Each structure stands twice: as C-alpha cells, then as structure tokens.
Amino acid sequence: MKKFFYRVQNGDGLLALSEKFSVPVGVLISLNNLTADLAQGDILYIERDERMRIYTVGVHETAESIAQKYCTTPEKILSDNAVDYLFYGLKIYL
C-alpha cells in the first residue's frame, strides 16, 4: 500500500484525481472527510492499493453479482466508487 499527501492544484477535481492515483472517489472522500468541493492548496491524504483494479461493468451485471465474483460486498463496491447504482459500461475500482 502506497501512502502519501497531495496538494490540490488549480483545476483538480475528485474524478480526475481518482483516475490519476487509481483510488476510488469514495475512498478519497472518506479518507479526507470531504464535504465540499476541492480548493487549490488543499492537502489530500492518498492511500493507493497497487492490487486495486479497474473493472468495466458488463451487461446485466449488478453490484451483487460483481461482489460475489470478487469476494467483497455490494455495499463496499458502491461506497468505494461513490455511486448509488451500477450501469453498463461504468468503470469501477475493485
């Protein structure tokens, strides 16, 4: 697990930082107790698990079916990715 701090730059957003550091948006939010938009100069704590992978949701897949395949819970998948539901083509972190 790689752990470090990052200073938010002008134009940074949660989605872009999530992709840049391969960390789910939900994890960034919870690690940093975020309740508002990011501002330039904010310091974020980043924990990146190199084992984490990006997964594209397939046709007719649900959080439950994906959770069963990857030995996790639907709640964790939804929470880590800061979404209420999954849909075809959505890229999520597992």
Which stretches of residues belong to each language-model region?
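Extracellular LysM carbohydrate-binding repeats and other cell-envelope/extracellular binding modules
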Residues: 24-56, 73-94
